[in-house]
């Protein structure tokens, strides 16, 4: 008997599991992204120059990270190098990778997740959203659906962006696109 895996392909999982590669793919697909640096050059000088171009406050994030590990909020240039070294060290220890991305910080954001579903024929739909803004240490504590600040126009725009993101990686199965507002 054949066993059929239901879910995203190994290629989609690998791509979306790396924040730098995922962000480059989303930008290429025209999906709105927070401005930042997701390049392959990872030396301190390159990242410092990118930080100056992005401006402060900014976030340093482990490309292989999740759950808030390998993340540092930097409020000014004087604190960048120490935060960079700390984030890189945590990323290596937690994920075995020293690749980092930089993003303009969104202070006190709403964390909204859009549910999507894709089939094996390339059809992808968005199903709704939930507000996951109540967090502790970057871990969700409460999920509220529907999102209380959502308008029909914003829901449509976010849903269409989530579908575009999923199509960019040929996503199959149930998934979630995370959005900061």
Specify the residue positions occupied by each region the protein language model found.
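N-terminal beta-alpha lobe that positions the nucleotide/phosphoryl donor
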Residues: 1-177, 181
């Amino acid at each position: 008997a054949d066993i059929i895996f239901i879910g995203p392909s190994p290629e989609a999982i690998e791509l979306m599991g790396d924040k730098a590669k995922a962000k480059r793919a989303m930008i290429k697909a025209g999906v709105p992204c927070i401005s930042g640096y997701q390049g392959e050059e990872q030396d301190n000088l390159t990242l410092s120059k990118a930080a100056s171009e992005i401006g402060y406050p900014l976030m340093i994030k482990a490309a292989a990270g999740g759950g808030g590990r390998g993340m540092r909020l930097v409020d000014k240039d004087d604190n960048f190098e120490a935060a960079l070294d700390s984030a890189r060290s945590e990323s290596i220890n937690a994920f075995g990778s020293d690749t980092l991305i930089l993003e303009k910080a969104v202070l006190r954001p709403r964390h909204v997740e859009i549910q999507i579903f894709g089939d094996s024929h390339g059809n992808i739909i968005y199903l709704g959203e939930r507000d996951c803004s109540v967090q502790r240490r970057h871990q969700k504590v409460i999920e509220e659906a529907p999102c209380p600040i959502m308008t029909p126009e914003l829901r449509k725009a976010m849903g269409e962006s989530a579908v575009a993101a999923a199509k960019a990686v040929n996503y199959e199965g149930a998934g979630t696109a995370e959005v900061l507002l």
